[in-house]
Swiss-Prot record:
<protein>
    <recommendedName>
        <fullName>Uncharacterized 8.8 kDa protein in pseT-alc intergenic region</fullName>
    </recommendedName>
</protein>
Amino acid sequence: MISWHQFEHLKGLIYESEMAAMIYGRQIQRLESLPPTNDVLLAQSRANLKNEYQNKWGKASKDLHDYIQSLVEKK
């Protein structure tokens, strides 16, 4: 059984992971709806933004996974 504090922390991590996933999806959709460009710097900037949002989602997902794993290992 997990404590109230652990449960609240888990809820927070789930929320952060879900929000990061939604933000990632929306931003990717927005970036992909932009007209194509031949400007190398603009194309690189778009790619960097995609990576940034993906990394934020990945970090939030990993934090959630690691916390769940730590709860499982405590049993």
